């Protein structure tokens, strides 16, 4: 599809699950996108944020909280969170 300037644009850009790297299909109505804000030492929003997309497969298995903790720990938003996957 083209816009008014004649540039090619897509109507749908597929997202990938941040936890599994699976492509999230258009009909996956259980998927969510969560934005985590970066704050300074005073707790004020710095204008930066990180978005995580979780597919319905992860949410249906009940692994979304552990996956989000793992992703936030990897990116440096949280520290020292207990994880069931590390205990095995």
UniProtKB/Swiss-Prot annotation:
Primary residence: cytoplasm
Locations listed in the record: Cytoplasm
GO molecular function: structural constituent of ribosome
Top-level taxon: Eukaryota
Pfam families: Ribosomal_S21e
Keywords: Cytoplasm, Ribonucleoprotein, Ribosomal protein, rRNA processing
InterPro entries in the cross-refs: Ribosomal_eS21 (IPR001931), Ribosomal_eS21_CS (IPR018279), Ribosomal_eS21_sf (IPR038579)
Subunit structure: Component of the small ribosomal subunit. Mature ribosomes consist of a small (40S) and a large (60S) subunit. The 40S subunit contains about 33 different proteins and 1 molecule of RNA (18S). The 60S subunit contains about 49 different proteins and 3 molecules of RNA (25S, 5.8S and 5S).
Protein name: Small ribosomal subunit protein eS21
Phylogenetic lineage: Eukaryota, Fungi, Dikarya, Ascomycota, Pezizomycotina
